[in-house]
């Protein structure tokens, strides 16, 4: 599923104006009969625009995180994420860039900035690996199961296949091979293994599987793909694992779950960004921009902005995500 990758995009014009004003304060931008528009006059208008304020916030975040974590984000990773996104959008990619006022280089910068924040968030999340958090994650953890799934694209098709799958003596493997649209499992008769921390299986499918007894077949499971479409799953549970009473038996898996949860936690991400901005001793000199920074740092005479600037740095989409184990490049863009 393609995800929005330019939710936090702003026009290059705003970026250029904010970057240039300090070097050309009195310069005329436009002249006309009886009047002129100077850089200062334009700046006074642009700086009160929400998109322009987000630009400045993103510029500050980029510079601060680049200074501290730049060596930890490789150019190859940025390039790979960019190419993955470009492939996902296909022939529409150039048009989407243009609609959002971005060049390819500007989009790569967005991806890099987001990766810098992702790295910082992951490092901060690793500090949350306390026994208490391990035990909390363990309480909600379901060990690996072996299941078979059939995925179809319409509810009518799903009902038709479900009737076959629940028929006495039904060969679920053969039904999956003949009907499933899931390329990763179809030729294996739908077989797949996952636990509650797996990110390559929809949550609704996991929930349905965990509720079954061995050899049980679920009802039709609806998984929304977007606002306007959905996929439909039928799940058969093949084998369950007994859950150990000792959380340490699952420590590696629980570690991944804890970190993944933190990477999707907007409040946690915002706290990481806030700490980095505070450590950088950032000061906001123009009162017009105080509100957008107030979510992260104390600014004299400012009030908290009603819109969340965390969207300019959060992971997806993820990480957002679901899909965090096989991220689309969209989760690498600043949202």
UniProtKB/Swiss-Prot annotation:
Pfam families per the UniProt record, alphabetical: Rotamase (PF00639)
Main localization, broad class: membrane
Single Gene Ontology MF annotation: peptidyl-prolyl cis-trans isomerase activity
EC numbers for this chain: 5.2.1.8
Domain PpiC span(s) in chain numbering: 142-239
Residues covered by region (Disordered): 300-335
SUPFAM superfamilies in UniProt: FKBP-like, Triger factor/SurA peptide-binding domain-like
Lipidated sites in chain (S-diacylglycerol cysteine): 21
Catalytic activity: [protein]-peptidylproline (omega=180) = [protein]-peptidylproline (omega=0)
Signal peptide location: 1-20
Positions with biased composition (Low complexity): 302-335
InterPro entries: Foldase_PrsA, PPIase_dom_sf, PPIase_PpiC, PrsA_foldase, Trigger_fact/SurA_dom_sf
Membrane topology reported for the UniProt record: Lipid-anchor
Lipidation (N-palmitoyl cysteine): 21
Subcellular location: Cell membrane
Keywords in alphabetical order: Cell membrane, Isomerase, Lipoprotein, Membrane, Palmitate, Rotamase, Signal
GO annotations of cellular component type: plasma membrane
Entry similarity comment: Belongs to the PrsA family.
HAMAP family named in the record: Foldase_PrsA
Function: Plays a major role in protein secretion by helping the post-translocational extracellular folding of several secreted proteins.
Protein name per UniProt: Foldase protein PrsA
Gene coding for it: prsA
């Amino acid at each position: 599923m393609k995800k929005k990758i330019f939710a936090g995009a702003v026009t290059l014009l705003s970026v250029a104006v904010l970057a240039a004003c300090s070097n050309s304060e009195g310069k005329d931008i436009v002249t006309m009969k009886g009047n002129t528009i100077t850089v200062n006059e334009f700046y006074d208008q642009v700086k009160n625009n929400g998109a322009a304020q987000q630009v400045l916030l993103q510029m500050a975040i980029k510079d601060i995180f680049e200074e501290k974590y730049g060596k930890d984000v490789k150019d190859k990773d940025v390039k790979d994420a960019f190419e993955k996104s470009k492939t996902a959008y296909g022939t529409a990619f150039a048009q989407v860039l243009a609609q959002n006022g971005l060049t390819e280089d500007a989009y790569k910068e967005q991806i890099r900035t987001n990766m810098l924040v992702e790295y910082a968030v992951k490092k901060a999340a690793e500090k949350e690996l306390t026994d208490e958090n391990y035990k909390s994650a363990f309480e909600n953890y379901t060990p690996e199961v072996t299941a078979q799934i059939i995925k179809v694209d319409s509810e009518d098709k799903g009902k038709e296949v479900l009737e076959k799958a629940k028929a006495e003596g039904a060969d679920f493997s053969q039904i999956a091979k003949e009907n499933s649209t899931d390329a990763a499992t179809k030729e294996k008769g739908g077989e797949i293994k996952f636990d509650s921390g797996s990110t390559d299986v929809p949550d609704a499918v996991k929930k349905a599987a965990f509720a079954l007894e061995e050899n049980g077949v679920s009802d039709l499971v609806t998984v929304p793909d977007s606002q306007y479409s959905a996929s439909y799953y039928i799940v058969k549970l093949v084998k369950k694992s007994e859950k150990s009473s000792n959380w340490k038996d699952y420590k590696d898996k629980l570690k991944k779950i804890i970190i993944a949860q933190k990477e999707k936690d907007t409040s946690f991400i915002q706290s990481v960004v806030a700490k980095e901005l505070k450590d950088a001793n950032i000061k906001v000199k123009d009162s017009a921009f105080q509100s957008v920074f107030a979510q992260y740092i104390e600014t004299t005479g400012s009030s908290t902005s009603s819109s969340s600037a965390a969207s300019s740095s959060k992971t997806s989409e993820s990480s957002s995500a679901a899909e965090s184990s096989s991220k689309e490049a969209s989760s690498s863009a600043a949202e």
